Amino acid sequence: MSDPITYNPGAVADFATDVASRAGQLQSIFDDTSNRTHALQEFFAGHGASGFFEAQAQMLSGLQGLIDTIRQHGQTTSHVLDSAISTDQHIAGLF
């Protein structure tokens, strides 16, 4: 094999941790926005309010989807790193 796969486990682990942190930050934004939206319900009524709250619910649903995707990306990166390290250790034992 002329082009072996190389990786820096420390950098990959840092990346996975950073991605998880970003998902946590987005979750905080989601929670704050959701709480503030719900707090408006007692002060905002009528046809305009219904449209507003439906739009907010749709936006929050999209944001939650993004958070879930980013969180999954961080977890997947971490699992792949663990598997790569395990494979490297196993192969080293074969020689």
Swiss-Prot record:
GO cellular component terms, semicolon-separated: extracellular region
Family: Belongs to the WXG100 family. ESAT-6 subfamily.
Superkingdom classification of source: Bacteria
Subcellular location: Secreted
Biological source species: Mycolicibacterium paratuberculosis (strain ATCC BAA-968 / K-10) (Mycobacterium paratuberculosis)
UniProt protein name: ESAT-6-like protein EsxC
Family annotation (Gene3D superfamilies): ESAT-6-like
Location (main, coarse): secreted
Keywords: Secreted
Gene transcribed to yield this protein: esxC
UniProt KW Lipid biosynthesis keyword: no
Keyword Repeat in annotation: no
